[in-house]
Amino acid sequence: ADQLAHSAIAPTGPAWQQIRERFGTEVFDEHGMVDRPKLGTLVFASYEARAALNKIVHPHVRVAISEWFTDLERLPSHCFGIVAIPLYFESSNAAPFDKIIVTACRSDTQLARVRMRGLSLHEARQRIDAQLPTDQKVRHADYAIWTDGRRADTDRRVQAISRELSAFSTT
């Protein structure tokens, strides 16, 4: 979904003009590209700005996901499709899926990972606070993949879920 959102806000994307009209030229660079760090600072500091951006971008992402699944269904050998949607539960109009998988980690790990993107402690906390708490996401999901441990443990969990989903998709 992140790639679809990036495409939607590109200069040739369907959301570009709406972002320009709503947020102004200050969130664009000299080449006409959305300056994602500037826009991120703005939308994670204001619920209203974040809601406005989501209202602009999410419909385009939902259409693209729907088209992708339609194309997938036409393939003779498809088992299941996976869509990575970072803010699935935070989206007011979350699309229905047969199964939901959440990747999760401890809060200290989450904070460290967000900080690795070059954000200040304050900015990182703003972004985390804008999300549904991990324990709530895990409760709403069909599967949870905890990513704090060893890579091999995560890989085993992914394989187990994949086997279960393969069985589910053939029923």
Regions found by a protein language model. Give the residues of each.
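Residue-level signature of catalytic and energy-coupling elements of molecular machines
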Residues: L53, I82, I145
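Short hydrophobic/aromatic-enriched beta-strand-loop microsegments
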Residues: A1, I100-A104, L121-H122
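Short beta->alpha linker loops
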Residues: V34, I56-V57, C105, D129-L132, ...
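Short histidine/acidic/glycine/proline-rich micro-motifs that form metal-
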Residues: A5-H6, R151
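ATP-dependent NMP and nucleoside kinases share a basic, alpha-helical "lid"
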Residues: R62, S66-S77, G81-M116
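ATP-dependent small-molecule kinase phosphotransfer cores
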Residues: H6-C79
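Well-ordered beta-strand positions
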Residues: Q3, T41, K99, D142-Y143
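Small-molecule kinase domains that catalyze NTP-dependent phosphoryl transfer to phosphate-bearing small molecules
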Residues: I65, A94-P96, A112, M116-T171
